[in-house]
Amino acid sequence: MEQPAPQPAYVLHSRAYKETSALVDFLTPQGRVRAVLRRARGKGGSLVRPFVPLEVELRGRGELKNVGRLDSTGIAAWLHGDALFSGLYLNELLMRLLPAEAPYPALFEHYTLTLQALAAGRPLEPLLRSFEWRLLDELGYAFSLSQDVNDAAVVADGLYRLRVDAGLERVELFQPGLFKGSELLALAEADWDAPGALLAAKRLMRQALAVHLGTKPLVSRELFRKR
């Protein structure tokens, strides 16, 4: 039988399983994979922590794999304070939204770079908004920031609302939750220094993600709020 090839991975979530094992959700270039790690109190179990770059060998053909081998491939991204809450938020988004065993190699790379940037103390908000947008795009939920639902160009002095199932729609009368065209055009260029861009990005991503996350609150968001 052909030996499965090791692949890079990060731990998204883990919990005790039976007496001495752990049930671990990994993020790999091949997607989110759930596997049983036996003898979790040994050397392998000490590696089952978030933000540690790993190499994992996964065995089995079913949805629930078995960990054949698990090794660290580098130094863990040392996150603390708000950066730690941000990393946990990314993990929870991936656990909630990423389908099992669907390959997303570019998203894996973006996740790796985001962890490194968080550990380096880069400003949190642009990193989080960029990751949220990349996740929406990879899952097929993204929409144009420079054109509205009628294929008209977004104009700086216009007002727009998000129709999650379609995209941005221009409106003539002010109402809560709208976005300025100038803000949307700044987001399209990732111009985080533009007036109002970061706040607009946070509102836009929250609206865009809400329909896919459902009504169950994000634990990481509650922890961040109570910090």
From Swiss-Prot:
Keywords: DNA damage, DNA recombination, DNA repair. It holds the Pfam family RecO_N. One of its GO terms (cellular component) is bacterial nucleoid. One of its GO terms (biological process) is double-strand break repair. Disulfide bonds: none annotated. It comes from the Bacteria. InterPro entries: ARFGAP/RecO (IPR037278), DNA_rep/recomb_RecO_N (IPR022572), NA-bd_OB-fold (IPR012340), RecO (IPR003717), RecO_C (IPR042242). Involved in DNA repair and RecF pathway recombination. Belongs to the RecO family. This is DNA repair protein RecO. It comes from Pseudomonas entomophila (strain L48). The lineage of its organism: Bacteria, Pseudomonadati, Pseudomonadota, Gammaproteobacteria, Pseudomonadales.
